[in-house]
Amino acid sequence: VLTKMRNREIDILVGTQMVTKGHDLPEVTLVGVIQADAALALPDFRAAERTFQLLVQVAGRAGRGALPGKVLLQTFQPEHFVIRRAIRHDVDGFLDEELVNRRELGYPPFSHLALIALDDPEEGRLQVEAMRLADVARAFTPAVEVLGPTAAPLARWKGRYRWRFLLRAKDRGKLREALVAVHRASALAHRDTRVALDIDPSHLL
């Protein structure tokens, strides 16, 4: 499809965010993004960063040749700082504003995180195990903050229920101590309960 686009055999390309990843299509002069703010609603502290990155990337697909380009964004939040900064391609302004938000909320780079994710075919058993392991981690408060446990945004996947909780600490050593304790305690979990520890998780979903 991309070859046809480059050869001018097609004029309109409809795709996912994959079309933003490094493709050089110099004849493209108009790019449209539907629901450009949708990802901002995801329960992940990196949602703003990823949305800004995507919008800047997709804007870079238009006007790469001799002709000028235009980008149209559909958004319900035109005054959101991510949308405003992306429209202006204001990387420094976005970083300044995002860092203020993260500092206020205590998210990286102003803290260290670890995600403990559990899944099990039996939801009741899973919930009990998630609470048990979270209680193990709470023995390390106040140095380590425990957020959750709660059902994951995608609460069931391939016949298995999913729960998770988050550990947050300013001291990486204290976080490591809590993780070691949780890891040891997880050895007592039911054989059908899977427990995964993710330090500095790339996503929280």
PLM features: what roles do these ranges have?
Residues V1-L13, M18-L42, A48, Q57-L205:
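Accessory helical-bundle/CTD segments and flexible terminal tails appended to RecA-like ATPase motors
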Residues L54:
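Glycine-rich S-adenosyl-L-methionine
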